[in-house]
Amino acid sequence: MDLENFLLGIPIVTRYWFLASTIIPLLGRFGFINVQWMFLQWDLVVNKFQFWRPLTALIYYPVTPQTGFHWLMMCYFLYNYSKALESETYRGRSADYLFMLIFNWFFCSGLCMALDIYFLLEPMVISVLYVWCQVNKDTIVSFWFGMRFPARYLPWVLWGFNAVLRGGGTNELVGILVGHAYFFVALKYPDEYGVDLISTPEFLHRLIPDEDGGIHGQDGNIRGARQQPRGHQWPGGVGARLGGN
């Protein structure tokens, strides 16, 4: 598979997010961009009016010998779960998926500034993974050491592993909280009560028109999105799809 076909096989919103999140950190790693302009901090955004920082913090991650493997895992999660959501749950409705990312990004930015978290890539990716896991909660996933469990538990397993191995876990908790907020407001509540609490702005539909068969709004996403349980496993411990359970 050549590079062009690989990229064209990724839905449009995921494609641009994935490309930015791989290229920009590499440019920073090799000194082509000044990383001092990339991170998120309350004082710089609010008091010094550097309003670009929530955006640069979304696509930049400090790649070092110590963080490089973790960055690769985040890029893999982004590719796998963002692609799955956009091409399955939001199939033909990339504008609705973009609105989900904007919703999550807005709240991740606020929480991360409050908690002095300088980069948004990890909590944003975890928020997307959380939504996928809730929509596909009965899918069986395989984790390290042969562990298998329903997808609904995957975000918490990742949180536990990172808390133990890296001494952190705050990034994952922010992602879980934001992902749950979106899932409840945009998917679960409308599915149970038939009332849309939020809806995608029309300008996003004009920017990325729905494909044939796509519908505007969020109502019914869970009913229409749940797939038959499938298997996932983690290559070398971290994730590719299996053909079945």
UniProtKB/Swiss-Prot annotation:
Keywords: Endoplasmic reticulum, Membrane, Protein transport, Stress response, Transmembrane, Transmembrane helix, Transport
UniProt keyword Plastid, yes or no: no
Subcellular location: Endoplasmic reticulum membrane
Region (Disordered): 218-245
Phenotype seen when the gene is deleted: Worms exhibit coelomocyte uptake defective (cup) phenotypes. Coelomocytes are scavenger cells that continuously and non-specifically endocytose fluid from the pseudocoelom (body cavity). Endocytosis by coelomocytes is not essential for growth or survival.
Alphabetized Pfam families for the sequence: DER1
Biased composition (Gly residues): 234-245
InterPro entries: DER1 (IPR007599), Rhomboid-like_sf (IPR035952)
GO CC term (a single one): endosome
GO biological process, one term: endocytosis
TM region(s), chain numbering: 6-26, 58-78, 101-121, 167-187
Induction: By endoplasmic reticulum stress.
Topology with respect to the bilayer: Multi-pass membrane protein
Function: Specifically required for the degradation process of misfolded endoplasmic reticulum (ER) luminal proteins. Participates in the transfer of misfolded proteins from the ER to the cytosol, where they are destroyed by the proteasome in a ubiquitin-dependent manner.
PANTHER family: DER1-LIKE PROTEIN, DERLIN
Protein family according to the UniProt entry: Belongs to the derlin family.
Protein name: Derlin-1
Organism field: Caenorhabditis elegans
Gene that this polypeptide is encoded by: cup-2
